[in-house]
Design a protein with these regions (language model features):
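Short acidic, Pro/Gly- and aromatic-enriched capping/linker segments at domain boundaries
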Residues: 188-203
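Acidic/His-rich structured neighborhood in mature extracellular/periplasmic domains
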Residues: 1-90, 199, 207, 214, ...
């Protein structure tokens, strides 16, 4: 994919973003591209910025076309097998599909074999704006095409399954929010401290957030840099999707980045200093997000791409909505009674009870992921939430003061 150059131009309104296997197509129409045989053209930046809000994997879509031409077709043609497209169309699975705006219409997959490959690759690796939106849905919707994509992209599905099982096991055994009970009722128990003092942490500003990096992680500079880079990406998306006034409040939440805290094998939001004291941890982490294991944070990004937003939603609910309100309680009660969240598709293809049903914190955080980003459980994106539970969708929007 890195062999495909990207041309960022300015002001040309006639052309959006597209892969051009031959630059002559551009020059013949009086464009002035760089002297390259092929490229992705992003000709009008404003349009690209607008389109990428609902199509966050838009550039990847065009890179897939580049991969199709360069690798599969060996720079002579688009190489994706026509038979793959014909089988998919004959199956009847791509006649009508839910789109990002909660409306059903003919999906772009049906346009031709190149678009089928690009659209389904978006879902395979990221988030598409047309159903199937994510990998789990693609696997359930069209398992044959799913396997063909894995082969075309040389993906180790067995390794992916092992990683997914490890994440599912970690989520079941290690809560993403810690200290809720202690925050509610208080506790005077404490254990002997066994942690590096705050003064030993390196501090940096990432997208406006105060980030503290543990001394052990600092000893692994490559890992630390990868974690910072991913965190920058995650926080950038929070800023891009969440309303500006709410972002200002979210930036008050510190983020602690550790190499390997055995008490936090993934991520957590520390709701109580009492809970931290009871296990001998640093009470300065109270009210903050902790990425307790940098390796796991990097490892599981593809399955939980909005996990940082999830963490920050806990902080927002605690500080701005007093841990919940009547609207949220009503929505949660209605969701529990409806049964629609009792057995939903999860990132690993399993059907499980939605973690949103646990309490108001989980309900708000999970569905904020869905509303602004991509969840790891159905409903995966806002369009599905709006279709499945429109009342809750409006409540989540209102709590974030979103338009």
């Amino acid at each position: 994919l890195q062999r495909v150059p990207i041309w960022l131009a300015n002001g040309e309104e006639r052309l959006g973003i597209a892969f051009h296997p031959k630059s002559s197509w551009l020059t013949e129409r009086d464009y002035q591209p760089p002297d390259l045989p092929l490229m992705i053209g992003v000709v009008r930046g404003k349009n690209y910025l607008h389109a990428s809000i609902r199509q966050p994997w838009l550039v990847f879509h065009e890179l897939v076309h580049g991969y199709d031409w360069l690798v599969l077709g060996k720079q002579q043609k688009y190489g994706i097998d026509a038979g793959l497209y014909e089988r998919a169309m004959k199956s009847g699975k791509y006649v009508s599909a839910l789109h990002w705006d909660s409306r059903y219409r003919k999906p772009y997959h049906a346009a031709n074999r190149m678009e089928l490959f690009a659209e389904t690759s978006e879902a395979f690796f990221g988030t598409n704006d047309i159903y199937p939106f994510v990998r789990a849905e693609l696997r359930a919707h069209d398992p044959k095409l799913f396997r063909e994509l894995a082969s075309l992209w040389n993906v180790d599905l067995d390794g992916q399954r092992r990683s997914s099982r490890a994440l599912a096991k970690t989520l079941e055994s290690s809560p993403l929010i810690s200290g809720l009970e202690e925050a509610a009722k208080g506790s005077d128990e404490s254990a002997a401290p066994a942690y590096a003092p705050t003064r030993r942490y390196a501090r940096c500003n990432i997208e406006g957030w105060n980030v503290l990096i543990g001394p052990e992680l600092e000893k692994s500079p490559k890992l630390a840099e990868k974690a910072r880079r991913l965190l920058r990406r995650d926080l950038h998306y929070v800023k891009r999707y969440v309303p500006a006034e709410a972002v200002k409040k979210l930036k008050r939440t510190k983020i602690w980045l550790e190499k390997d805290n055995p008490d936090v094998p993934y991520l957590t939001f520390h709701a109580s200093d009492k809970h931290l004291a009871s296990r001998g941890d640093n009470v300065d982490k109270a009210g903050a997000v902790e990425i307790g294991n940098a390796e796991n944070y990097l490892r599981w990004f593809g399955r939980e791409p909005s996990i940082i937003l999830h963490m920050l939603a806990y902080a927002y609910l605690q500080s701005e909505i007093d841990g919940g309100n009547d609207d949220l309680a009503t929505a949660l009660s209605r969701a529990r009674k409806s049964g629609r969240y009792d057995k939903v598709l999860r990132f690993d293809g399993q059907r499980v009870r939605h973690p949103a049903l646990a309490n108001q914190y989980e309900f708000f955080a999970e569905l904020s992921e869905t509303y602004f980003g991509t969840n790891d459980h159905y409903p995966f994106i806002r369009g599905e939430l709006k279709e499945a539970d429109g009342k809750t969708c409006k409540i989540i929007s209102r709590l974030w003061t979103s338009k």
